[in-house]
């Protein structure tokens, strides 16, 4: 037998042994759970667009209990729906769980020059979070309120045209146009509305569709293939919608830098405070690349952290990218679910309209007025409970071997929350957990957070940074719609909604009628 055949045989046996070792990880640990297939584990379930894997978690929870183990390609994941366990991981033991599950296409969170808030970890995450936080303060939200209001008015014009036809419309399409337009204007330097003519929308939609997930599936099973695909997409971004969008952002940043240089040469002083996210991040731009040095630092709450308030050029691209995707998809979905639930619960919709009429009597709606819409806030929170968004990112990576409530977790193991089961747990929500009941929030939400039972925006130090912006957008748009229209179901409305997706769970469509409240 030739030497080459011996080497090939040894490599094959080693390769096979490695994957069987990973696949059998939870069997050796004595932890229950679905096994799937060697090499793959259950990763194929998470890429079934028509039958979302995130909903499959609930089926497995019923079979294996509130804590069980799965493998996803080369990743080992503990799935949990025990509220106390979730709170322990996300809050109390954050020092041991400050990372997130990653995919080779995303790159190494410590070395990827375009790492963003969702991907970054350790000191780098701390720095990015510190720099981005002022963008989402109440002071900043008040400043962009007028821009959001202008976008709302533009969408209302399109909804008026749709309502006049007397037919049901897919509100998900309208809400996606709305949220992308807002992000474009407050984050990307877009100076006018591009609603229903935005060239970026097809690219963004593709990221969340079935076809956009295949590279991640391959990379999850064969990491080296993911690394090679990442290098290919970086060199040829047109082959990937995500990398194509980042390429567009790079051009927008360079254009803004050129404008700044031209203004400086002409003696034009900056207009004062940053006008959008690009300005904010460019003001914090660093002239040096310190990422490699930063990745060697330790990370713990007990350390005295001095945060260097600078961003690299590539990090700015990363932040804009994640703000675009997160701000576009989740808010559009939340609006869709809220509208559907109001249409199917007319008594709740009527109560909400009464609050809107009382608190917002004028055509123009102010920041202070929407802050007084307490029942609307209850409606949105309850919609987010019944249809949790982006729950695939409700995970943490164990960065240091530890013990959580008697369960030993090895370094490198992921902890994934079964958010859908958690949000319907009768022990947290009561026997009416399956009912749409906004009134459950009228006493506040602190108790539900404290129990570890509510994760619409995540939990702990890594909770979604943009949740206040999302709430402002949603409350403002719903106020304008409900002042003028009533959401009604039609023969085209799918009841219950048909849910699809992978990274996020989306309705296939939300076909509703907009019935005018007052005749002209």
Curated annotation (Swiss-Prot):
Heme binds at residue 464. Keywords: Heme, Iron, Metal-binding, Monooxygenase, Oxidoreductase. One of its GO terms (molecular function) is oxidoreductase activity, acting on paired donors, with incorporation or reduction of molecular oxygen. The keyword Isomerase does not apply. InterPro entries: Cyt_P450, Cyt_P450_CS, Cyt_P450_E_grp-I, Cyt_P450_sf, Cytochrome_P450_3A. Its cofactor is heme. The keyword Iron applies. Its EC number is 1.14.-.-. It is an enzyme of class 1 (oxidoreductase). Belongs to the cytochrome P450 family. Cytochromes P450 are a group of heme-thiolate monooxygenases. They oxidize a variety of structurally unrelated compounds, including steroids, fatty acids, and xenobiotics. This is Putative cytochrome P450 CYP13A4.
């Amino acid at each position: 037998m030739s030497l080459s055949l011996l080497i090939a045989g040894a490599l094959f046996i080693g390769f096979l042994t490695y994957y069987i070792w990973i696949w059998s990880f939870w069997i050796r640990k004595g932890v229950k759970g679905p096994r799937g297939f060697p090499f793959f584990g259950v990763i194929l379930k998470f890429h079934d667009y028509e039958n979302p894997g995130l909903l499959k978690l609930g089926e497995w929870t019923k079979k294996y209990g509130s804590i069980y183990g799965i493998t996803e390609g080369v990743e080992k994941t503990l799935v949990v729906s025990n509220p106390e366990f979730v709170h322990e991981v996300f809050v109390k033991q954050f020092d041991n769980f400050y990372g997130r599950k990653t995919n080779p296409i995303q790159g190494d969170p410590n070395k990827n020059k375009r790492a963003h808030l969702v991907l970054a970890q350790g000191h780098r995450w701390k720095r990015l979070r510190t720099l981005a936080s002022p963008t989402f303060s109440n002071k900043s939200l008040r400043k962009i309120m007028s821009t959001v209001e202008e976008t709302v008015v533009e969408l209302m014009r399109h909804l008026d045209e749709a309502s006049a036809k007397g037919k049901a419309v897919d509100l998900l399409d309208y809400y996606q146009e709305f949220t992308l337009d807002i992000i474009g204007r407050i984050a990307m330097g877009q100076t006018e509305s591009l609603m229903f003519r935005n060239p970026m929308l097809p690219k963004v939609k593709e990221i969340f569709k079935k076809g956009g997930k295949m590279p991640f599936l391959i990379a999850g099973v064969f990491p080296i293939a993911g690394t090679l695909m990442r290098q290919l997409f970086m060199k040829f971004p047109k082959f990937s919608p995500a990398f194509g969008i980042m390429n567009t952002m790079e051009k927008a940043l360079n254009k803004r830098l050129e404008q700044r240089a031209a203004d400086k040469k002409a003696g034009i002083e900056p207009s004062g405070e940053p006008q959008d996210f690009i300005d904010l991040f460019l003001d914090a731009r660093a002239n040096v690349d310190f990422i490699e040095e930063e990745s060697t630092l330790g990370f713990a709450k007990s350390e005295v952290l001095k945060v260097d308030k600078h961003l690299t050029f590539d990090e700015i691209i990363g932040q804009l990218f994640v703000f675009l995707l997160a701000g576009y998809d989740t808010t559009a979905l939340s609006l869709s679910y809220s509208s559907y639930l109001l249409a199917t619960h007319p008594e709740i919709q009527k109560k909400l309209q009464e609050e809107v009429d009382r608190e917002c009597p004028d055509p123009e709606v102010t920041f202070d007025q929407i802050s007084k819409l307490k029942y609307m806030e209850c409606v949105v929170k309850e919609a987010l409970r019944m249809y949790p968004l982006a729950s695939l990112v409700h995970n943490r990576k164990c960065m240091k071997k530890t013990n959580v409530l008697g369960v030993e977790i090895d370094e490198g193991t992921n902890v994934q929350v079964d958010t859908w089961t958690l949000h319907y747990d009768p022990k947290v929500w009561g026997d009416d957990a399956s009912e749409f009941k906004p009134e459950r929030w009228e006493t506040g939400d602190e108790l539900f957070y404290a129990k570890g039972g509510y994760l619409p925006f995540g939990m702990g130090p890594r909770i979604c940074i943009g949740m206040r912006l999302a709430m402002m957008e949603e409350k403002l748009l719903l106020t304008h719609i409900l002042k003028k229209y009533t959401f009604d179901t039609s023969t085209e409305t799918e009841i219950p909604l048909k849910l699809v997706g992978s990274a996020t769970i989306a309705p296939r469509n939300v076909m509703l009628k907009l019935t005018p409240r007052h005749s002209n």
